[in-house]
UniProtKB/Swiss-Prot annotation:
Encoding gene, per UniProt annotation: DOR14
Broad EC category: oxidoreductase
Function, as annotated: Catalyzes the oxidative decarboxylation of 6-phosphogluconate to ribulose 5-phosphate and CO(2), with concomitant reduction of NADP to NADPH.
Protein name: 6-phosphogluconate dehydrogenase, decarboxylating
EC annotation from Swiss-Prot or TrEMBL: 1.1.1.44
Active-site residues, as the UniProt record annotates them: 208 (proton acceptor), 215 (proton donor)
Length: 517
């Protein structure tokens, strides 16, 4: 349990007065929670620590009893053995949070709850639901007078217990009724809760989806830095751990850098050798990174780094194919001693590459959310989102403070790279970034995330790209038309018109239309 100041203790005491009432017929639960896996149990304990009376329910009721007899014993936590009993113990408006497997189980529990709920009651889905499902539930429940909230919850089991990052969205009428609970139990960054209202319908789960996509990108970038140190620098795991420990004291200070340090320091107790080197090099995924990449394609936003992070996991899963290909496909390899003569410069370059690529990853993530806000009619608070991610979640980092500051100063900022801080940072990091990608290519080390981040940056800063030729090709084989470059108009190539040319004739035939291909 966290330490609280005197005012907080008085608040907790007042909240607990109803719990001390022995009359069981009085509805005294502040919030109900369905799903007693570790995340659910820890979030209940967190709420109880903050003075809230929580009613716990699980499909397997024996789990409720075990929880009450052990972790929840002596705390302001009540149990329920049925949905009706859960609802009956809650104050109005009833606030019920689901922490169950995404998909059909969420709909099943909602359907079980509905017969016992009244207009104005609140259902909160705190699982990893896909945002289109949250959009649907928001609409369906609104017709029944039930306020639906889809909330991203990040931070894992530890975060749920000590303070997660919470990203609620849905029916805004619910926010005044859940705001105090959510912001009390959420992680704090510089005294501010890592929780705020995100937006309508499925916006909360959308923001959590993008969070998870960025998480994929951050992890892949870290793995590529590790791979370069291991295979090109020939560093021992302890040395690499030392590098990450140093990086965690600077601009890269973050949860993922911190745990990477810990992993690299950990030795198998049976033989004293680094445990990480004994792990099969095939990475799993639950699909949220893929959701982000697919949505980026749907909205036409080049979220290339997250896409490559997803594909890298797919390639890692092709272990048998890679083993076979490693024997047949030729290319540069580093054998014997490391070709790196200046280790400090090599490490400094990698730090710059990691920092610059991280900036690109977040730039792309916020570009995607900006477009989603336009397409889906949401009002997203980018500064608030960055603040939510500063603590309690997997991608929490010092770096996010600068994003929060940028969007507070310029709420309508379209691209983080155009904000002075990030423009300056990526300019300074560019030399080491390019050197690291160059070494990876030279020595045959795959760095898809570093490389695509750099390609995106160079593409974005290019006033002219070769898409003119691409559009001509499309017009050649499919009559998809094109527009003429400003200043190149003539009697055949008319301004602001879509033009088709018969490319096979000498000089060609020209036609124009206002059709946008």
């Amino acid at each position: 349990m966290k330490n609280f100041n005197a005012l907080s203790r008085l608040s907790i005491l007042s909240k607990q007065l109803s719990f001390n009432n022995t009359n069981s017929s009085i509805a005294r639960g502040d919030i109900g929670l369905i799903g007693l896996a570790v995340m659910g149990q820890n979030l209940i304990l967190n709420m109880a620590d903050h003075g809230y009376t929580v009613v716990a329910y699980n499909r397997t009721t024996a789990k409720v009893d075990r929880f009450l007899e052990n972790e929840a014993k002596g705390k302001s936590i009540l149990g329920a053995h049925s949905i009706k009993e859960l609802v009956d113990q809650l104050k109005r408006p009833r606030r019920i949070m689901l922490l169950v497997k995404a998909g059909a189980p969420v709909d099943e529990f909602i359907n079980q709850l509905l017969p016992y709920l009244e207009e104005g009651d609140i259902i909160i889905d705190g699982g990893n639901s896909h945002f289109p499902d949250s959009n649907r539930r928001y609409e369906e429940l609104a017709k029944k007078g039930i306020l639906f909230v889809g909330s991203g919850v990040s931070g894992g089991e530890e975060g749920a217990r000590t303070g997660p990052s919470l990203m609620p969205g849905g029916n805004e009428k619910a926010w005044p009724h859940i705001k105090e609970i959510f912001q009390d139990v959420a992680a704090k960054s510089d005294g501010e809760p890592c929780c705020d209202w995100v937006g309508d319908a499925g916006a909360g789960h959308y923001v959590k989806m993008v969070h998870n996509g960025i998480e994929y990108g951050d992890m892949q970038l870290i793995c590529e830095a590790y791979d370069l140190m291991k295979r090109v620098g020939k560093f021992e795991d302890k040395e690499i751990g030392d590098v990450f420990a140093t990086w965690n004291k600077g601009v890269l200070d973050s949860f993922l850098i911190e745990i990477t340090r810990d992993i690299l320091y950990y030795n198998d107790p049976t033989d004293g050798k680094p445990l990480v080197e004994k792990i099969l090099d095939t990475a799993g995924q639950k699909g949220t990174g893929k959701w982000t990449a697919v949505n980026a394609l749907d909205l036409g936003i080049p979220v290339t780094l997250i896409g490559e992070a997803v594909f890298s996991r797919c390639l890692s899963a092709m272990k048998a194919e890679r083993v076979e290909a490693s024997k047949a496909l030729k290319g540069p390899q580093v054998t014997g001693e490391s070709p790196i003569t200046d280790k400090k410069q090599f490490i400094d370059d990698l730090e710059q590459a990691l920092y610059a690529s991280k900036i690109i990853s977040y730039t792309q993530g916020f570009m995607l959310m900006n477009q989603a806000a336009k397409d889906y009619g949401w009002k997203l608070n980018n500064a608030g989102i960055a603040l939510m991610w500063r603590g309690g979640c997997i991608i929490r980092s010092v770096f996010l403070a600068e994003i929060t500051a940028a969007y507070r100063k310029k709420p309508d900022l379209e691209n983080l790279l155009l904000y002075p801080f990030f423009n300056d940072a990526i300019t300074k990091a560019q030399s080491g970034w390019r050197a690291s990608v160059g070494k990876a290519i030279q020595y045959g080390i795959p760095t898809p995330a570093f490389s695509t981040a750099l390609a995106f940056y160079d593409g974005l800063r290019s006033e002219r790209l070769p898409a003119n030729l691409l559009q001509a090709q499309r017009d050649y084989f499919g009559a998809h038309t094109f527009k003429v470059l400003p200043g190149q108009e003539n009697e055949l190539l008319k301004k602001d018109e879509w033009i088709h040319i018969n490319w096979t004739g000498r000089g060609g035939d020209v036609s124009s239309t206002t059709y946008d291909a």
